[in-house]
Amino acid sequence: MRFSKQKLFRLLDILDTNSFNETHTFMVPKGYWEKFIEESDPIDKEFLNEIENMAGSKITTSATGLIAFWGNFTKILLIPPFPIMKAYRKPFIYTSSIREFLEQQYLIGVILIRLGKYAVGIFQGDQILDSKSGSRYVKGRHKAGGTSQQRFARIRTKQIQELFNKVCSITTEKMTPFKKQLDYIFMGGEKHTILNFSKTCPFIQSMEDKIANRIISTREPSLRELLSTPSKVWGSEVKLFQWPDS
């Protein structure tokens, strides 16, 4: 299940308040799982192997790393919204570093694009610094065959490229002043459209190392939709395997 930042803070409050016995805390960056296990004591190794067996490699090799509250009676995993930079372990429930992580005020670029509509914005934490949204007509698909279909396809392809060019131009204009400071760029819309747009936009290609793997769910790009993206960006995946009786 997906938790908002606020809901995740409430979960951390509950964990802190109850201080469940024999629950260890693990924070593991991407690509560090095997080494993290090697560096563990026998008790931690047992818990970490159990996590791997119960959650699977898809979780332990997450693109943003893994946070775990794990013991004999408590088994909770978190997939954070942004990459974990530092590994740590505690033989008790420890939420301070996670809270600091969630309170970061990242500078984030957002591009929402579907065929016909777009929205581009810059956020510092939850605050929007600059944005632009709009539309550009793109014909729907043509079901008939023959010459008319080919002509229609050429027109549609041209319109799509014109949309991509416009969105790329706006993205470049809005994000260039923040280029060196940007922490991440998130994109939202249909995966196929996003991939094709990314291939045609030099600015996006130059920022490849800043592009987040996760695609933001977007119904229809607009300023209103853009303003809702921080809550989506900061959502964490929570997997509750066991919750102790309180």
Feature map (PLM): residue ranges:
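Terminal alpha-helical anchor/extension segments at protein ends
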Residues: 1-246
